[in-house]
Structures are given as C-alpha cells and as structure tokens.
C-alpha cells in the first residue's frame, strides 16, 4: 500500500527521522528503486569492454552509458586510448539503437567510415563504406580480416553463412541505398557538407554520428581533452613544426601547403595520431544547414560529454520557408579567464591574445598600480611586476606539502605578459594625469577640444594607417573579454519547387507501419483459412475456392516516405521502358492482376539486388587483395586474404594468367563467371580473376532481365497444400499430359527426383524437356503450354511463379507444396521482401501422409503445439498416416563426429553447413565413395522434397542454433524417412524441438 506524503510527514514528526517506521519506509523505497534499476539493467544489451580502464575512466563510461546498457568491464587488456575505444563501441550501439532493426522490416543502416568487423561479429544489418585512402586504411583492413578469421575459427557455427558487408568506395560514390546511416568518428575527412552529399547519394534522410569535440578549437591553436587524455594542435602549413622538420615532411608540406590541419595525439601513447583538415572539423562546430540536390540538411548537436559530441543530420525535401537558425558553442571553462594582448613584434605592431586567470591579472595589476613610480626606471617597474606574476603562479611548500598557487604561465609568454601589464599600468597613469589636468582647464579650452575632436580623430586614423608604430594605444588593445559562448546564425532559404507536405508524409509513414501490421494479420488469417479446408480425396475432386480479401496498396502523395517506394527519401526515378507494362499493371483495377505485377516487380528488384551483392562481395575481396580497377594484377598478401575468406566460403579462389588456381577446384565445380578489374562476367584462361560460391551459378542478372520483359499473367493458380508425404509427386504423375503440360520445380534436385519418378531417368532428353526448373524456363526458349504443374511451390517467389506462367502463356497452374515447411527465403536480409507468399485463386488441403511412419504423427503434432503460437491452427494437428511402419525414431548422444555411425545405406541431414562439412570430411577419412558424400549428405534446406528409407539427423554443436527452434526446419528433418530416423547429437541444446519431443516419446504397440 502506497504511503502518502502527509502520512510520511506525520511519521517523521511523531517518531523522528531515526524512528523504526521511518527507517523501514526509507529502506523499502530505496530497495524498490534499486531493484527497478537492476531489472532495467538486466533487460539492457550486454556490452563487454575488454580495455583496461582506471577508476575515473570507468566512471566516465558508466555515467554516459551505464543506464542504457549492461556494461561488463572485464579489464582484460591494455589497449591504445582505451577509454576512447570503449566509448566508440558504445557510441556505435547507441547510434544503431536510434533506428528500427527488428520485426517485419529489416532496415539496412549505412556506416560511413566505420569498422565493418564490429558489425560482422555482432550480426548487424549494416553496410560500411570504408575507403582505402592510404596505407593506414589498408593496415586497418588487414587487421580486421585477421579479427574476422580469428572469430570464425573459434566459432564456425555462429558465423556460418555470414558475410562481411562493406565496400572500399568513398561514401559519395557508393550506390547502396538505405534510409538511415551512422558515422562514428567518420566525418573528420568529409566535413558536414561531405556527409550531406553522401546522404543524398544513398537516399538517406537520417544520420547519427559522433566526433571528438573541444569548443576551444574555435579560438586556440592547441588544447587538451582531459577525459580522453588527448592533446590536439592546429598545424598551419602542414608539417612546419620544428620537431617534425625532415626531408619527407618538407615534401609533404609542399603537397598540402595552404591547408590548416589539426592533429589529435593521445597522452603517453606511441600509436599513430589522427590528422585531419581543420575546415572539415570546424564545419561541425559552425555550420547549421546545407542545401544540395533538392534537399536541405540540418545538423543538431545532441549531447556533449567526455569530449565526445553526438550529433544528428536530418534531410528534408522540397521548399523550406526562410528561417534564421541559431546555435551556440559554449565554453564553461572560460568564465574565470580574461584575454590579455601581448606584443609579438619589436615595433609593437603585431599582438596576440593569451588567456590569463582573472584573479592573477587583478592582483598583479593592483600591486603594479600601487608600486608605480615615475622616478624609477622601466626595468625596476618591470621586475616588480614579474615578481608578483611569479608569486601568483608558483609552487609553495607548506609543512612538507607542495601546493600550486594559481596556474603556471607559459615560459615563452611570461616576460611579455609582464611587459604588457607594465605598459597597461603606464597607460592608465598617463590617462589619469590627463583627466586631472583637464579638471582645472577653462571652458573655452574644453570647447576647443570638443570642436576639434573630429579633426583629431581623422589625424589619428591617418597616422595609424601610414605609421602603425605611431598609432595611439587604447584600453581594448590590452584587455579582451572572453565570452563563455559563441553564437552562429544561419539563414536557411531554399527554393526547390514543390512544397513538402508534412501532414501527407506523416500519414504515409503511418500507412507504411499499418500495412506491415495488416500483412502479419493477413498471413495468420490465411494460414487459419487454409488449415480449415477439406482434404483432397482424389484428382477429380474440385478444388475448394478461397476468397482472397486484398486491398489496394496505400499510395503516398509524393515519393517521399512512400510505403511502396523501396528508396525512402529520394525523388521517384523514371522507370526503364521494360517496366512500363508491369508498372501500369500494378495500377490495374483488377486486384489480382495488380498483386501479380507487384510481385513480379519485387522479384526483379530482388534479383537485381542479389546481382549487386555478388559484385559488391567480389569487389571487396578484390580490393582487400590489393587489386585496382585499372590493371589486371593483385598485390602480395594473397594467401592471408583468401585463407580468411575461405573459412566462410570454401569456393573462394584465384585464377592466375598461367591457368593454375590458388586452391584445388572441387571435383564437379565449374565457375560460370569471375571478377577482375573489368567487372563480373565470363573470363578467359589467360586472365587473372577471382571467384566465390556465387560464381558457380550466377544468373540473377539474367533472371531480372527476363522478367522485366514479361507482363503479369491472367491464368488461374490452384494450390494443393498437403502435409509431408501426401503423394504430391504421385499426383503430378497422374495429372501430367505431355501434349498440354510442363512440370516446373524450384531446384535442380527436385527436378531430378520428378524425372526419375515419371521417366525412370534424370538426364534423358524427354525427361529434361518436360521437367524444368523455374530458372531454366525463364533463361531459355521454351514452347508454350496451357497448363503448368509446379512441385514444391513454396520454395518459389510469387513473382517468379507469375513470370513462369507468363512466359509459357499458361492459362492454369496447379501448384503442390506444404505451406508449413521451409518457404522461399530472401538471401539478402536488407531487402524489404513483402510479396513472396503465393496468392492462389483456389486452394485445397491434404492431411494424409503415405511416407511418414505412425510414430512420427504424434511427434510432429506435439512439436507443432510447442513451436507455433497459442491458438494457431495447423494441418499437422489433425494429420493421419497410412504407413505400415509403427516405430521408426530413435536418438543417441555422441561425443564427437568420429562416433557418428556412417552407413552408405542411410541419408544424412544437418541443420548447418558446418556440420555438413564435418560429415563430408569424416566420410573422406573413412574412404567412402564420393557418390555417397555428394548425394547422401545434405542440409535440411537442401533435403526438402526428398524421400529416403533411412535418415540420420546429426548435430555436432551445443552452441545456440535457432534452426532447431524453427518448426518448418524441424518438420522437414523429421518427415524425410520412410522406415527409420535416428537423431545423433553432441551435448544438450536449449530449445531443441526435436530432442524435446523425442525425450517424451514412447514406442507404439
């Protein structure tokens, strides 16, 4: 029960603050607050800081990020500028947290100049633009490759299939499009305007970044950031400093003459310093807006802490009203200082301003005024002032303890400061003498002086210009008031035509989010409807019609923030001629036709994206190996680079002009294309080029081009949604009519299985004519047919299915598949996939299996109940088996791959490529035939649609693997066998669905 403030006051008044009731109440409130903080910390992201930090540095990072992240300061190793490195990791995570990264839409984030290996290790969906501007950048790339290699070797399962996502292009020249971007200390070489131009090139509207910050840079030539232990210094005329004078630096000075650089040196560290152009860093302190290519970009400085500035840049389109934008750079450390001008040249023409504590100057001038005497020589006056100045900045010893009185004055400025104070004192005495003499002057003389003041002012101006050494001195030449802030006013006036309708765009963003939610709801409703349909009894039974309720996609008023526009923040680009027909069909009043055209357009964009990814990946490897885009050569260090990439891609290789390969090419592997300075394409034996796994079958560009030229089909799509082993291939065999039909499969293995079932051979001319893969149909000339029979249709993108129907001129497609098994999945996590699900005109279900034994039925039913959301319906909750095999499943724990029971009569499946590779290696060690490990060892994804008598599922790792929690993957694994299934695993894995249901399994009698 809550205690009101009045009751609390009464308790304190009656019992006192030390009373038991008051103490208990305070303890309760304190414990509740502490528990709440601990719970919040447990929910936060765990961030492990290995750098060794002292007490003050630990407090800095905890005060900045301790409330947001669960920081673990392990104090493992000494690292260069440890606090700055630890802060950089937290800054990266903090900036990424500003953008959506989970849910239906996996938004890609760009990182301008960041460390791509950080994102690779954490699995971030981030593309890094990391140009090689010099040897330092190449050293960093090599170091990051080493870190990636080390991580993969230590934990190959975690990084299986994960590729680093970066390019070596400057940010302005990279064509990867994304809504959001970060720049963690990456803006030093680009400046504010450079970042804005990079954002415009990428279609980015929101950037969040960090940089080192010290307001004193605006008026000082050097300074110190105490939290980071970083000294900064402006270097004019490049390397003109005496301590840096050398032949090399003099040459460099000529190359960058006229530029003012700024160097950041970390205290007591011999690591390489950071040197950048001052104008780029200054732009983040002084600039406010920048208009470029139809957009106005504004910078907002968010947080300044521990010498780190966090800022954000937002781009807005269209016309902006005139506005004066004001911001300040504050210098709180200057409130106790005053500026004193001291002479630099002997003729007293050149002066400079130095900072001096206000108390020191006040006390020194006070004593100087009291001790001033006209009869003394200037040297005696000077010594008195120097003595006072020295006492105000000296070290004194009291009872054996050394104490600093004031601040020490720079040894080079010390005599000139005393000399300037002496001149200032003399000027004041002379001015007071004139005032005293004027006190007794007559009215006429005062009138004459007032009348001739303009003349005297003119004479002084002429004398000051012609004879600078004769100009009179004024008070302002000695003392300068130091402001505690600097104000910058930027008048933002842009006229770019169309006015940006903020309200309409806000509605578009809302519609965008609502459409995501509706899509999720529609998918759930569709799954429920399909599950409630009657099963298919025979081929002649009419298929149940499903009324699809769809609605037109929301359209935005402008192209900005348009939910249907994949590049948010860019003006709508003109469509190529090939897409005009499909684009026109997307606006058709026929909802079904519009859906199919939109799906085909998405499939075109998806294949184009995959093609660009292949080019980007190969270009990254080419540049990492020292290649350029002018000559056909690679620099040294090839073995290290390709050994590192070989850990994630065993097909990465180098072909030399002599015809040899760096690594032996696996038997049966033939590369379609390669990559070198000419780009991606077919290569000759006399060329130097590189390849990876994507070069074996590289047809994405051809598929996108083929689909562009087609239009959406108007034929009928029927779907038979059946459980595993319900006889889909048998139904295709019964329905097939050579005169009117063509059989389409999703992959080559399924095509071979269907050919064997229908024609008894997988490579005969007749079998290859009537059974084709979807890719083969789109890439080659095919005859027109009236009906298409599609096997494992869930592995196809809906747009690809529509393209196949369009090219074959088919009026009907009868599709077979299982909507609850592994469906089509995007190979690019950053691609916004929305229209891959098959939308049939007619749908029916089949819930009887002829393949799976009797004991598999309750296991799968139990597995569906545990994995699927509460209330979700599934075909497998009421499926039946016609198999005569009663008991088929078993399991056993094994310590390593060496004890896996390898038998040529069994079919082996794994969830991961790493486990598959380990089994293949084991089979080679046992000298088993190549036909066995080439055809009898597959991943679960590769084995979908396959039927075998004896199946063994192998898991060799107990580390986290989400595939064992996925119902579609576990369903495929448990329904491939006809006679026996054995699960062999190493160690316990939390959340393993198959192990969970097998643990409660009892044999059927």
Curated annotation (Swiss-Prot):
Membrane topology reported for the UniProt record: Peripheral membrane protein
Domain (+)RNA virus helicase ATP-binding: residue ranges: 695-846
The protein's Enzyme Commission number: 3.6.4.-, 2.1.1.-
Keyword flag Hydrolase: yes
InterPro entries in UniProt: (+)RNA_virus_helicase_core_dom, 1a_necrotic_phenotyp-det_dom, Alphavirus-like_MT_dom, CMV_1a_C, P-loop_NTPase
Alphabetized GO MF terms: ATP binding; helicase activity; hydrolase activity, acting on acid anhydrides; mRNA methyltransferase activity; RNA binding
This protein's UniProt keywords: ATP-binding, Helicase, Host endoplasmic reticulum, Host membrane, Hydrolase, Membrane, Methyltransferase, Nucleotide-binding, Transferase
Subcellular localization, as worded in the UniProt entry: Host endoplasmic reticulum membrane
Residues annotated for ATP binding in this entry: 722-729
Domain Alphavirus-like MT positions: 72-285
Domain of life: Viruses
Methyltransferase, as annotated region: 51-404
Assembly behavior: Interacts with RNA-directed RNA polymerase 2a.
Protein name: Replication protein 1a
Species name: Peanut stunt virus (strain J) (PSV)
